[in-house]
Amino acid sequence: MSTNQTKSSQGAKKGTRNIIITGGAGFIGSHVVRLFVNKYSDYEIYNLDKLTYAGNLANLKDVEDKPNYHFVKADICDFERVYALMQEKEIDGIIHLAAESHVDRSIKDPFTFAQTNVMGTLSMLQAAKLYWESLPEKWEGKRFYHISTDEVYGALEMTHPAGVEPPFSTKASSGEHHLAYGTKFFTEDLKYQPHSP
């Protein structure tokens, strides 16, 4: 068992923010994890990653021994595991980056893409909803950030009505549509949409 997996079995520390970053061993996710681990030493960062073709813990060698970094090997589609982690670590923030990527792979294996990008996002939302709803303060101070891709809507002009180009974008946009479900119970609707040049 690695040091990080041992550390992840400890209970949550009081007085800190406890944040899950999904897909934290991926290219973009590892940069987000590194930023949070180094910038917010009072936050406990839980890198939840399945370690598929896109995930590589070597991306995080420089932070793996930091006391506020914890690796959790798990699948975002495993609702029970995600929900248990949220309860055990008293999670109050989620940065959701985990997703199947690469358009070519979506053509070869559309079911895996749909399972991860659609049902995985729904699993994360539902775990957050149920856990945060059970707390006395409910959703106060809680945050769920879903990071997506510019491929959701394909090659559209910014003024074009939303549309999708299958198959990759269909699965990615389905995950985004589940966020409409999330706005029914989260108190704030914070949106940030990066654009490719």
Language model features with spans:
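N-terminal Rossmann-like NAD(P)+-binding domain of SDR-like oxidoreductases, especially those catalyzing
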Residues: 2-197
